[in-house]
Amino acid sequence: MIGLNHYLIVSGLLFCIGLAGMLKRKNILLLFFSTEIMLNAINIGFVAISKYTHNLDGQMFALFIIAIAASEVAIGLGLVILWFKKFKSLDIDSLNAMKG
């Protein structure tokens, strides 16, 4: 039988993969993907704990995170497209070329 520990281990591993992607990658698009992996790992943890404690708060919070992540992707992808049109690169090191 799959217990709570198994879900939390998978959630922790996914979060570590996302964190490693955030620290290792220089591409803005891959940073967004890594952020989404970390958010999904958090959702797995919330839903697993919610299921095993018979409390719906974790599931409601996971739905809220999904909604926030969807809006983040919509806004972030729009900004990435504009960034690529202007600078022809998605490299994070070119961020210091911004003037403000």
UniProtKB/Swiss-Prot annotation:
Protein's gene: nuoK
Family under the similarity heading: Belongs to the complex I subunit 4L family.
Subunit structure: NDH-1 is composed of 14 different subunits. Subunits NuoA, H, J, K, L, M, N constitute the membrane sector of the complex.
Physiological role: NDH-1 shuttles electrons from NADH, via FMN and iron-sulfur (Fe-S) centers, to quinones in the respiratory chain. The immediate electron acceptor for the enzyme in this species is believed to be ubiquinone. Couples the redox reaction to proton translocation (for every two electrons transferred, four hydrogen ions are translocated across the cytoplasmic membrane), and thus conserves the redox energy in a proton gradient.
UniProt catalytic activity: a quinone + NADH + 5 H(+)(in) = a quinol + NAD(+) + 4 H(+)(out)
Compartmental location: Cell inner membrane
Protein name: NADH-quinone oxidoreductase subunit K
Record key words, sorted: Cell inner membrane, Cell membrane, Membrane, NAD, Quinone, Translocase, Transmembrane, Transmembrane helix, Transport, Ubiquinone
Membrane-protein topology: Multi-pass membrane protein
EC number(s) on file: 7.1.1.-
EC primary class: translocase
Organism: Helicobacter pylori (strain Shi470)
Single GO cellular component term: NADH dehydrogenase complex
One BP term from GO: ATP synthesis coupled electron transport
Alphabetized GO MF terms: NADH:ubiquinone reductase (non-electrogenic) activity; quinone binding
